[in-house]
Curated annotation (Swiss-Prot):
Gene3D superfamilies assigned to the protein according to its UniProt record, in alphabetical order: 1.20.5.110, DNA helicase RuvA subunit, C-terminal domain
Summary of the function given for this chain in its UniProt record: Essential cofactor of the RNA polymerase L that plays a central role in the transcription and replication by forming the polymerase complex with RNA polymerase L and recruiting L to the genomic N-RNA template for RNA synthesis. Also plays a central role in the encapsidation of nascent RNA chains by forming the encapsidation complex with the nucleocapsid protein N (N-P complex). Acts as a chaperone for newly synthesized free N protein, so-called N0, allowing encapsidation of nascent RNA chains during replication.
Region: Interaction with the nucleocapsid (N-RNA), residue numbers: 459-507
Lineage: Viruses, Riboviria, Orthornavirae, Negarnaviricota, Haploviricotina
Modified-residue entries (Phosphoserine), positions: S86, S151
Quaternary state and interactors: Homotetramer. Interacts (via multimerization domain and XD domain) with polymerase L; this interaction forms the polymerase L-P complex. Interacts (via N-terminus) with N0 (via Ncore); this interaction allows P to chaperon N0 to avoid N polymerization and non-specific RNA binding before encapsidation. Interacts (via C-terminus) with N-RNA template (via Ntail); this interaction maintains the P/L complex anchored to the nucleocapsid template during the sequential transcription. Interacts (via C-terminus) with protein C this interaction allows C to associate with the ribonucleocapsid.
Region annotation (Disordered) ranges: 42-91, 133-163, 201-227, 252-273, 285-307
Compositional bias (Acidic residues): 144-160
Family: Belongs to the morbillivirus P protein family.
Descriptive protein name: Phosphoprotein
Keywords for the protein's UniProt record, in alphabetical order: Phosphoprotein, Viral RNA replication
Entry keyword S-adenosyl-L-methionine: no
Any Pfam family the entry gives: Paramyxo_P_V_N
InterPro entries: P/V_Pprotein_paramyxoviral, Paramyxo_P/V_N, RNA_pol_Pprot-P_XD_paramyxovir
Length: 507
Protein backbone atom coordinates (compact mmCIF):
# COMPACT_ATOMS: atom_id res chain seq x y z
CA UNK A 1 0.00 0.00 0.00
CA UNK A 2 2.78 2.42 0.87
CA UNK A 3 4.68 1.64 -2.35
CA UNK A 4 1.54 2.23 -4.40
CA UNK A 5 0.88 5.57 -2.76
CA UNK A 6 4.51 6.61 -3.24
CA UNK A 7 4.23 5.75 -6.92
CA UNK A 8 1.06 7.85 -7.21
CA UNK A 9 2.81 10.83 -5.66
CA UNK A 10 5.85 10.40 -7.90
CA UNK A 11 3.70 10.24 -11.07
CA UNK A 12 1.72 13.29 -10.00
CA UNK A 13 4.86 15.33 -9.39
CA UNK A 14 6.23 14.33 -12.80
CA UNK A 15 2.97 15.44 -14.43
CA UNK A 16 3.15 18.80 -12.70
CA UNK A 17 6.75 19.31 -13.81
CA UNK A 18 5.74 18.45 -17.38
CA UNK A 19 2.86 20.94 -17.22
CA UNK A 20 5.26 23.61 -16.02
CA UNK A 21 7.72 22.86 -18.80
CA UNK A 22 5.06 22.75 -21.57
CA UNK A 23 1.66 24.08 -20.49
CA UNK A 24 -1.48 22.66 -22.10
CA UNK A 25 -3.13 24.90 -24.61
CA UNK A 26 -6.33 26.65 -23.71
CA UNK A 27 -8.05 25.22 -26.78
CA UNK A 28 -7.48 21.68 -25.61
CA UNK A 29 -8.69 22.54 -22.14
CA UNK A 30 -11.81 24.13 -23.63
CA UNK A 31 -12.61 21.05 -25.71
CA UNK A 32 -12.20 18.82 -22.67
CA UNK A 33 -14.46 21.05 -20.64
CA UNK A 34 -17.09 21.04 -23.37
CA UNK A 35 -16.97 17.26 -23.49
CA UNK A 36 -17.38 17.09 -19.72
CA UNK A 37 -20.40 19.40 -19.89
CA UNK A 38 -21.98 17.06 -22.46
CA UNK A 39 -21.40 14.13 -20.12
CA UNK A 40 -23.31 15.89 -17.37
CA UNK A 41 -26.32 16.14 -19.73
CA UNK A 42 -26.03 12.42 -20.79
CA UNK A 43 -25.40 10.27 -17.68
CA UNK A 44 -25.91 7.08 -19.70
CA UNK A 45 -22.66 7.55 -21.52
CA UNK A 46 -20.65 7.89 -18.34
CA UNK A 47 -19.32 4.35 -18.28
CA UNK A 48 -18.48 3.93 -22.01
CA UNK A 49 -15.05 2.43 -22.63
CA UNK A 50 -12.59 3.22 -25.37
CA UNK A 51 -9.15 2.25 -26.46
CA UNK A 52 -6.23 4.45 -25.54
CA UNK A 53 -5.51 7.29 -27.92
CA UNK A 54 -1.98 8.50 -28.36
CA UNK A 55 -1.32 12.13 -27.63
CA UNK A 56 -0.89 14.37 -30.66
CA UNK A 57 0.99 17.43 -29.53
CA UNK A 58 0.67 17.83 -25.82
CA UNK A 59 4.18 16.60 -25.03
CA UNK A 60 3.13 14.84 -21.81
CA UNK A 61 5.47 12.10 -20.65
CA UNK A 62 4.30 8.58 -19.93
CA UNK A 63 3.94 9.05 -16.16
CA UNK A 64 1.56 11.95 -16.88
CA UNK A 65 -1.12 9.63 -18.32
CA UNK A 66 -3.62 10.40 -15.61
CA UNK A 67 -7.19 9.30 -15.31
CA UNK A 68 -9.83 11.98 -15.14
CA UNK A 69 -12.54 10.59 -12.89
CA UNK A 70 -16.12 11.11 -13.95
CA UNK A 71 -18.63 12.92 -11.84
CA UNK A 72 -22.32 12.58 -11.92
CA UNK A 73 -22.73 16.26 -11.11
CA UNK A 74 -20.35 17.49 -13.78
CA UNK A 75 -17.35 18.21 -11.52
CA UNK A 76 -14.23 16.23 -12.51
CA UNK A 77 -11.40 15.04 -10.29
CA UNK A 78 -7.79 14.36 -11.26
CA UNK A 79 -6.69 10.85 -10.36
CA UNK A 80 -3.21 9.30 -10.35
CA UNK A 81 -2.44 6.05 -12.04
CA UNK A 82 -3.39 3.23 -9.69
CA UNK A 83 -2.24 -0.36 -9.40
CA UNK A 84 -5.37 -1.69 -11.08
CA UNK A 85 -5.11 0.37 -14.29
CA UNK A 86 -5.21 -1.37 -17.66
CA UNK A 87 -3.38 -0.52 -20.85
CA UNK A 88 -6.21 -1.72 -23.09
CA UNK A 89 -9.35 -0.62 -21.29
CA UNK A 90 -9.78 3.00 -20.35
CA UNK A 91 -12.34 4.81 -18.32
CA UNK A 92 -13.68 7.93 -19.94
CA UNK A 93 -16.24 10.47 -18.97
CA UNK A 94 -18.57 9.79 -21.85
CA UNK A 95 -16.31 11.54 -24.37
CA UNK A 96 -16.75 10.07 -27.87
CA UNK A 97 -13.77 8.63 -29.64
CA UNK A 98 -14.05 11.14 -32.45
CA UNK A 99 -13.56 13.95 -30.02
CA UNK A 100 -10.47 12.31 -28.62
CA UNK A 101 -9.05 11.74 -32.10
CA UNK A 102 -9.77 15.27 -33.18
CA UNK A 103 -8.34 16.85 -30.09
CA UNK A 104 -4.64 17.54 -29.73
CA UNK A 105 -4.55 17.46 -25.96
CA UNK A 106 -2.98 14.06 -25.74
CA UNK A 107 -4.83 13.24 -22.52
CA UNK A 108 -5.53 9.57 -22.04
CA UNK A 109 -8.16 8.34 -19.61
CA UNK A 110 -8.01 5.04 -17.81
CA UNK A 111 -10.25 2.91 -15.76
CA UNK A 112 -9.88 3.02 -11.99
CA UNK A 113 -9.88 -0.45 -10.47
CA UNK A 114 -10.15 -1.61 -6.91
CA UNK A 115 -7.82 -4.20 -5.40
CA UNK A 116 -9.90 -7.08 -6.72
CA UNK A 117 -9.51 -5.94 -10.33
CA UNK A 118 -13.09 -4.73 -10.82
CA UNK A 119 -13.87 -1.30 -12.20
CA UNK A 120 -15.54 0.93 -9.69
CA UNK A 121 -17.88 3.83 -10.22
CA UNK A 122 -16.65 5.71 -7.19
CA UNK A 123 -13.53 5.34 -5.14
CA UNK A 124 -14.44 2.66 -2.64
CA UNK A 125 -11.08 0.99 -2.08
CA UNK A 126 -9.60 0.78 1.38
CA UNK A 127 -6.93 3.44 1.10
CA UNK A 128 -9.35 6.18 0.02
CA UNK A 129 -9.96 9.04 2.39
CA UNK A 130 -13.35 10.69 2.01
CA UNK A 131 -13.64 14.05 3.76
CA UNK A 132 -16.76 16.18 3.91
CA UNK A 133 -16.17 19.64 2.57
CA UNK A 134 -18.68 21.37 4.76
CA UNK A 135 -18.44 24.52 2.61
CA UNK A 136 -21.72 24.62 0.69
CA UNK A 137 -25.01 23.49 2.07
CA UNK A 138 -26.67 22.70 -1.26
CA UNK A 139 -23.99 20.24 -2.42
CA UNK A 140 -25.31 16.70 -2.74
CA UNK A 141 -23.57 13.40 -2.18
CA UNK A 142 -23.82 10.41 -4.47
CA UNK A 143 -23.61 6.78 -3.24
CA UNK A 144 -22.50 7.73 0.27
CA UNK A 145 -19.27 9.49 -0.86
CA UNK A 146 -18.45 12.86 0.68
CA UNK A 147 -16.90 15.89 -0.96
CA UNK A 148 -13.21 16.33 -0.28
CA UNK A 149 -11.78 19.49 1.19
CA UNK A 150 -8.67 18.98 -0.93
CA UNK A 151 -10.42 18.50 -4.31
CA UNK A 152 -8.21 18.92 -7.32
CA UNK A 153 -10.61 20.32 -9.96
CA UNK A 154 -13.85 22.21 -9.38
CA UNK A 155 -16.06 23.53 -12.15
CA UNK A 156 -18.21 26.53 -11.38
CA UNK A 157 -21.33 27.68 -13.18
CA UNK A 158 -20.79 30.05 -16.11
CA UNK A 159 -21.76 33.64 -15.51
CA UNK A 160 -23.72 35.91 -17.84
CA UNK A 161 -20.61 36.88 -19.79
CA UNK A 162 -19.80 33.29 -20.60
CA UNK A 163 -16.84 32.97 -18.29
CA UNK A 164 -16.57 30.39 -15.58
CA UNK A 165 -17.09 31.38 -11.99
CA UNK A 166 -15.15 29.38 -9.47
CA UNK A 167 -17.49 27.99 -6.88
CA UNK A 168 -15.59 25.52 -4.75
CA UNK A 169 -17.82 22.81 -3.42
CA UNK A 170 -20.98 24.03 -5.19
CA UNK A 171 -21.21 21.15 -7.68
CA UNK A 172 -22.40 17.73 -6.51
CA UNK A 173 -19.45 15.33 -6.52
CA UNK A 174 -19.67 11.57 -6.32
CA UNK A 175 -16.13 10.52 -7.29
CA UNK A 176 -13.53 10.38 -4.47
CA UNK A 177 -9.82 10.52 -4.72
CA UNK A 178 -6.82 9.10 -2.95
CA UNK A 179 -5.18 11.42 -0.46
CA UNK A 180 -1.81 10.02 -1.42
CA UNK A 181 -2.26 10.96 -5.11
CA UNK A 182 -1.92 14.71 -4.80
CA UNK A 183 -0.18 16.31 -1.84
CA UNK A 184 -0.55 19.81 -0.50
CA UNK A 185 2.64 20.95 -2.21
CA UNK A 186 1.19 19.93 -5.59
CA UNK A 187 -1.76 22.27 -5.07
CA UNK A 188 0.62 25.18 -4.66
CA UNK A 189 2.50 24.20 -7.81
CA UNK A 190 -0.73 24.01 -9.82
CA UNK A 191 -1.67 27.48 -8.60
CA UNK A 192 1.73 28.72 -9.74
CA UNK A 193 1.09 27.17 -13.16
CA UNK A 194 -2.32 28.84 -13.43
CA UNK A 195 -0.83 32.17 -12.38
CA UNK A 196 1.78 31.92 -15.15
CA UNK A 197 -0.94 31.05 -17.69
CA UNK A 198 -3.08 34.00 -16.63
CA UNK A 199 -0.12 36.37 -17.03
CA UNK A 200 0.60 35.12 -20.52
CA UNK A 201 -2.88 36.12 -21.80
CA UNK A 202 -2.30 33.80 -24.74
CA UNK A 203 -5.39 31.67 -24.19
CA UNK A 204 -8.92 32.81 -24.90
CA UNK A 205 -11.40 32.40 -22.08
CA UNK A 206 -13.86 29.61 -22.67
CA UNK A 207 -16.89 28.44 -20.82
CA UNK A 208 -14.92 26.38 -18.28
CA UNK A 209 -11.75 27.08 -16.36
CA UNK A 210 -9.53 24.86 -14.26
CA UNK A 211 -9.95 25.72 -10.58
CA UNK A 212 -7.65 24.24 -7.94
CA UNK A 213 -8.34 24.92 -4.26
CA UNK A 214 -5.56 26.55 -2.25
CA UNK A 215 -3.39 24.42 0.04
CA UNK A 216 -5.05 23.79 3.39
CA UNK A 217 -3.96 26.02 6.23
CA UNK A 218 -2.59 23.85 9.10
CA UNK A 219 -3.33 26.64 11.57
CA UNK A 220 -7.03 26.52 10.74
CA UNK A 221 -7.83 23.17 12.30
CA UNK A 222 -11.46 22.22 12.60
CA UNK A 223 -12.62 21.34 16.08
CA UNK A 224 -16.13 20.34 15.07
CA UNK A 225 -17.21 16.76 15.44
CA UNK A 226 -16.78 15.82 11.77
CA UNK A 227 -16.45 12.16 10.85
CA UNK A 228 -13.30 11.35 8.89
CA UNK A 229 -13.04 8.31 6.67
CA UNK A 230 -9.62 6.70 6.98
CA UNK A 231 -7.99 3.72 5.28
CA UNK A 232 -7.61 0.41 7.12
CA UNK A 233 -5.74 -1.67 4.46
CA UNK A 234 -9.01 -3.44 3.68
CA UNK A 235 -12.40 -2.73 2.11
CA UNK A 236 -13.76 -1.34 5.32
CA UNK A 237 -13.60 2.23 6.56
CA UNK A 238 -12.88 3.34 10.12
CA UNK A 239 -14.70 6.43 11.33
CA UNK A 240 -13.04 8.74 13.81
CA UNK A 241 -14.34 11.86 15.42
CA UNK A 242 -12.62 15.14 16.03
CA UNK A 243 -13.84 16.41 19.40
CA UNK A 244 -12.82 19.24 21.64
CA UNK A 245 -11.45 18.88 25.15
CA UNK A 246 -13.77 16.98 27.48
CA UNK A 247 -13.02 19.19 30.49
CA UNK A 248 -14.34 22.72 30.60
CA UNK A 249 -14.00 25.37 33.22
CA UNK A 250 -16.19 25.44 36.29
CA UNK A 251 -17.79 28.74 37.16
CA UNK A 252 -18.19 31.29 34.35
CA UNK A 253 -17.23 34.82 35.25
CA UNK A 254 -19.77 37.57 34.93
CA UNK A 255 -19.53 39.60 31.73
CA UNK A 256 -19.27 43.36 31.88
CA UNK A 257 -22.11 45.44 30.54
CA UNK A 258 -21.46 46.83 27.10
CA UNK A 259 -21.47 50.66 27.00
CA UNK A 260 -22.96 50.71 23.48
CA UNK A 261 -26.68 50.28 23.01
CA UNK A 262 -27.78 47.35 20.78
CA UNK A 263 -29.15 48.30 17.40
CA UNK A 264 -31.54 45.38 17.10
CA UNK A 265 -34.09 43.86 19.46
CA UNK A 266 -32.71 42.38 22.66
CA UNK A 267 -32.61 38.64 23.33
CA UNK A 268 -34.55 37.23 26.30
CA UNK A 269 -32.37 36.32 29.28
CA UNK A 270 -34.90 34.68 31.53
CA UNK A 271 -33.26 31.24 31.37
CA UNK A 272 -29.77 32.49 32.21
CA UNK A 273 -28.51 30.72 35.38
CA UNK A 274 -27.34 32.74 38.33
CA UNK A 275 -23.66 33.21 39.07
CA UNK A 276 -22.00 30.81 41.51
CA UNK A 277 -18.88 31.27 43.62
CA UNK A 278 -17.30 27.95 42.67
CA UNK A 279 -18.14 24.85 40.66
CA UNK A 280 -16.54 21.57 39.71
CA UNK A 281 -15.28 20.68 36.24
CA UNK A 282 -17.97 19.61 33.78
CA UNK A 283 -17.46 16.34 31.91
CA UNK A 284 -18.83 16.53 28.40
CA UNK A 285 -19.71 13.28 26.62
CA UNK A 286 -20.97 12.46 23.18
CA UNK A 287 -21.92 9.03 21.87
CA UNK A 288 -19.60 9.45 18.86
CA UNK A 289 -16.51 10.01 20.99
CA UNK A 290 -16.41 6.43 22.17
CA UNK A 291 -15.82 7.40 25.79
CA UNK A 292 -17.80 6.23 28.79
CA UNK A 293 -19.09 8.20 31.74
CA UNK A 294 -18.49 7.05 35.29
CA UNK A 295 -21.52 6.54 37.56
CA UNK A 296 -20.38 9.49 39.62
CA UNK A 297 -20.50 11.86 36.63
CA UNK A 298 -23.92 10.43 35.63
CA UNK A 299 -25.26 11.19 39.09
CA UNK A 300 -23.86 14.69 38.82
CA UNK A 301 -25.62 15.19 35.48
CA UNK A 302 -28.90 13.95 36.90
CA UNK A 303 -28.67 16.18 39.97
CA UNK A 304 -27.21 19.16 38.14
CA UNK A 305 -24.04 20.17 36.35
CA UNK A 306 -22.63 22.02 39.34
CA UNK A 307 -22.04 21.15 42.97
CA UNK A 308 -23.93 23.05 45.59
CA UNK A 309 -21.79 25.52 47.56
CA UNK A 310 -22.79 24.02 50.91
CA UNK A 311 -22.19 20.48 49.69
CA UNK A 312 -18.80 21.48 48.30
CA UNK A 313 -17.80 23.07 51.62
CA UNK A 314 -18.96 19.97 53.50
CA UNK A 315 -16.83 17.80 51.25
CA UNK A 316 -13.84 20.03 51.90
CA UNK A 317 -14.44 19.80 55.66
CA UNK A 318 -14.62 16.02 55.44
CA UNK A 319 -11.34 15.93 53.50
CA UNK A 320 -9.69 18.14 56.11
CA UNK A 321 -11.00 15.95 58.95
CA UNK A 322 -9.75 12.81 57.24
CA UNK A 323 -6.32 14.38 56.77
CA UNK A 324 -6.25 15.32 60.47
CA UNK A 325 -7.24 11.78 61.49
CA UNK A 326 -4.52 10.37 59.26
CA UNK A 327 -1.96 12.69 60.88
CA UNK A 328 -3.07 11.67 64.39
CA UNK A 329 -2.84 8.02 63.45
CA UNK A 330 0.71 8.55 62.25
CA UNK A 331 1.63 10.16 65.59
CA UNK A 332 0.06 7.27 67.52
CA UNK A 333 1.93 4.75 65.39
CA UNK A 334 5.24 6.55 66.04
CA UNK A 335 4.58 6.50 69.81
CA UNK A 336 3.73 2.82 69.71
CA UNK A 337 6.98 2.14 67.92
CA UNK A 338 8.87 4.05 70.66
CA UNK A 339 7.04 1.99 73.31
CA UNK A 340 8.11 -1.19 71.60
CA UNK A 341 11.71 0.02 71.70
CA UNK A 342 11.40 0.81 75.43
CA UNK A 343 9.93 -2.61 76.06
CA UNK A 344 12.98 -4.21 74.49
CA UNK A 345 15.30 -2.07 76.63
CA UNK A 346 13.39 -3.03 79.81
CA UNK A 347 13.72 -6.70 78.96
CA UNK A 348 17.48 -6.30 78.50
CA UNK A 349 17.75 -4.49 81.88
CA UNK A 350 15.89 -7.32 83.57
CA UNK A 351 18.28 -9.84 82.12
CA UNK A 352 21.27 -7.83 83.35
CA UNK A 353 19.79 -7.64 86.87
CA UNK A 354 19.28 -11.39 86.94
CA UNK A 355 22.90 -11.91 85.91
CA UNK A 356 24.08 -9.59 88.69
CA UNK A 357 21.97 -11.44 91.26
CA UNK A 358 23.54 -14.70 90.19
CA UNK A 359 27.02 -13.17 90.53
CA UNK A 360 26.23 -11.84 94.02
CA UNK A 361 24.98 -15.25 95.13
CA UNK A 362 28.17 -16.83 93.85
CA UNK A 363 30.30 -14.31 95.78
CA UNK A 364 28.32 -14.95 98.95
CA UNK A 365 28.99 -18.66 98.61
CA UNK A 366 32.69 -18.06 98.19
CA UNK A 367 32.87 -15.67 101.17
CA UNK A 368 31.21 -18.21 103.44
CA UNK A 369 33.99 -20.71 102.72
CA UNK A 370 36.97 -18.32 103.15
CA UNK A 371 38.96 -18.28 106.43
CA UNK A 372 39.89 -14.80 107.64
CA UNK A 373 42.78 -14.33 110.11
CA UNK A 374 42.25 -11.58 112.70
CA UNK A 375 45.41 -10.01 114.22
CA UNK A 376 45.70 -9.13 117.91
CA UNK A 377 45.86 -12.55 119.54
CA UNK A 378 49.58 -12.96 119.29
CA UNK A 379 50.45 -10.52 122.04
CA UNK A 380 53.08 -11.07 124.66
CA UNK A 381 51.62 -12.38 127.95
CA UNK A 382 53.68 -9.83 129.83
CA UNK A 383 51.94 -7.06 127.95
CA UNK A 384 49.49 -5.27 130.27
CA UNK A 385 46.89 -5.27 127.46
CA UNK A 386 47.08 -9.03 127.07
CA UNK A 387 44.42 -9.73 129.70
CA UNK A 388 41.92 -7.33 128.10
CA UNK A 389 38.87 -9.25 127.02
CA UNK A 390 38.30 -9.09 123.29
CA UNK A 391 34.96 -9.34 121.61
CA UNK A 392 33.97 -12.99 122.08
CA UNK A 393 32.40 -13.08 118.60
CA UNK A 394 35.80 -12.51 117.03
CA UNK A 395 37.82 -15.66 116.71
CA UNK A 396 41.40 -16.16 115.54
CA UNK A 397 40.14 -18.08 112.48
CA UNK A 398 36.59 -17.77 111.16
CA UNK A 399 35.23 -20.65 109.17
CA UNK A 400 32.47 -23.17 108.99
CA UNK A 401 34.38 -25.42 111.37
CA UNK A 402 34.99 -23.60 114.64
CA UNK A 403 37.75 -26.01 115.68
CA UNK A 404 39.55 -25.98 112.39
CA UNK A 405 43.38 -25.32 112.53
CA UNK A 406 43.32 -24.63 116.28
CA UNK A 407 45.35 -27.75 117.10
CA UNK A 408 48.20 -26.58 114.96
CA UNK A 409 48.64 -23.19 116.59
CA UNK A 410 47.71 -23.79 120.22
CA UNK A 411 49.94 -25.36 122.84
CA UNK A 412 47.29 -27.60 124.33
CA UNK A 413 45.48 -30.31 122.40
CA UNK A 414 41.95 -29.75 121.33
CA UNK A 415 40.52 -32.52 123.58
CA UNK A 416 42.00 -31.13 126.76
CA UNK A 417 40.82 -27.67 125.92
CA UNK A 418 37.30 -28.94 125.34
CA UNK A 419 37.26 -30.78 128.69
CA UNK A 420 38.59 -27.75 130.53
CA UNK A 421 36.00 -25.60 128.86
CA UNK A 422 33.22 -27.91 129.89
CA UNK A 423 34.35 -27.79 133.54
CA UNK A 424 34.43 -24.01 133.48
CA UNK A 425 30.85 -23.98 132.19
CA UNK A 426 31.64 -22.29 128.86
CA UNK A 427 33.73 -23.02 125.86
CA UNK A 428 36.78 -20.77 125.64
CA UNK A 429 38.50 -20.19 122.34
CA UNK A 430 41.44 -18.45 123.93
CA UNK A 431 44.70 -20.34 124.10
CA UNK A 432 48.45 -19.84 124.18
CA UNK A 433 49.94 -19.79 120.72
CA UNK A 434 53.32 -21.20 119.99
CA UNK A 435 56.22 -18.79 119.86
CA UNK A 436 56.79 -19.35 116.20
CA UNK A 437 53.22 -18.40 115.43
CA UNK A 438 53.03 -15.37 117.67
CA UNK A 439 53.16 -11.89 116.09
CA UNK A 440 55.93 -9.55 117.08
CA UNK A 441 54.96 -6.26 118.74
CA UNK A 442 54.77 -3.15 116.54
CA UNK A 443 57.81 -0.87 116.90
CA UNK A 444 57.06 2.81 117.43
CA UNK A 445 60.26 3.94 115.70
CA UNK A 446 59.71 1.87 112.60
CA UNK A 447 57.38 2.48 109.68
CA UNK A 448 54.33 0.23 109.59
CA UNK A 449 50.71 0.24 108.59
CA UNK A 450 49.96 2.28 111.69
CA UNK A 451 52.13 5.22 110.62
CA UNK A 452 55.10 6.41 108.57
CA UNK A 453 58.38 7.07 110.40
CA UNK A 454 61.02 8.55 108.06
CA UNK A 455 64.64 7.47 108.23
CA UNK A 456 67.75 8.17 106.20
CA UNK A 457 67.06 5.39 103.69
CA UNK A 458 66.10 6.02 100.07
CA UNK A 459 62.68 4.48 100.64
CA UNK A 460 61.72 7.22 103.07
CA UNK A 461 62.79 9.93 100.61
CA UNK A 462 60.78 8.27 97.83
CA UNK A 463 57.70 8.18 100.08
CA UNK A 464 58.07 11.90 100.87
CA UNK A 465 58.45 12.73 97.13
CA UNK A 466 55.27 10.78 96.39
CA UNK A 467 53.42 12.69 99.12
CA UNK A 468 54.57 16.02 97.61
CA UNK A 469 53.56 15.05 94.04
CA UNK A 470 50.13 13.76 95.06
CA UNK A 471 49.29 16.83 97.13
CA UNK A 472 47.23 19.79 95.90
CA UNK A 473 49.99 22.31 96.40
CA UNK A 474 50.89 24.69 93.61
CA UNK A 475 53.55 23.62 91.17
CA UNK A 476 56.00 26.32 92.22
CA UNK A 477 55.80 25.27 95.86
CA UNK A 478 56.14 21.60 94.87
CA UNK A 479 59.37 22.36 93.03
CA UNK A 480 60.62 24.36 96.05
CA UNK A 481 59.84 21.48 98.46
CA UNK A 482 61.61 19.04 96.16
CA UNK A 483 64.77 21.14 96.27
CA UNK A 484 64.58 21.33 100.09
CA UNK A 485 64.17 17.53 100.31
CA UNK A 486 67.32 17.04 98.27
CA UNK A 487 69.28 19.31 100.63
CA UNK A 488 68.22 17.49 103.88
CA UNK A 489 70.80 14.97 105.17
CA UNK A 490 70.02 13.82 108.68
CA UNK A 491 67.18 11.67 110.03
CA UNK A 492 65.99 14.34 112.49
CA UNK A 493 65.88 16.98 109.76
CA UNK A 494 64.01 14.58 107.51
CA UNK A 495 61.49 13.85 110.28
CA UNK A 496 60.94 17.58 110.88
CA UNK A 497 60.53 18.15 107.15
CA UNK A 498 57.93 15.38 107.05
CA UNK A 499 55.98 16.92 109.94
CA UNK A 500 56.10 20.37 108.25
CA UNK A 501 54.94 18.85 104.96
CA UNK A 502 51.97 17.15 106.60
CA UNK A 503 50.92 20.43 108.26
CA UNK A 504 51.05 22.23 104.89
CA UNK A 505 48.98 19.52 103.23
CA UNK A 506 46.38 19.39 106.04
CA UNK A 507 45.70 23.15 105.88
Amino acid sequence: MAEEQARHVKNGLECIRALKAEPIGSLAIGEAMAAWSEISDNPGQERATYKEEKAGGSGLSKPCLSAIGSTEGGAPRIRGQGSGESDDDTETLGIPSRNLQASSTGLQCHYVYDHSGEAVKGIQDADSIMVQSGLDGDSTLSEGDNESENSDVDIGEPDTEGYAITDRGSAPISMGFRASDVETAEGGEIHELLRLQSRGNNFPKLGKTLNVPPPPDPGRASTSETPIKKGTDARLASFGTEIASLLTGGATQCARKSPSEPSGPGAPAGNVPECVSNAALIQEWTPESGTTISPRSQNNKEGGDHYDDELFSDIQDIKTALAKIHEDNQKIISKLESLLLLKGEVESIKKQINKQNISISTLEGHLSSIMIAIPGLGKDPNDPTADVEINPDLKPIIGRDSGRALAEVLKKPVASRQLQGMTNGRTSSRGQLLKEFQLKPIGKKMSSAVGFVPDTGPVSRSVIRSIIKSSRIEEDRKRYLMTLLDDIKGANDLSKFHQMLMKIIMK
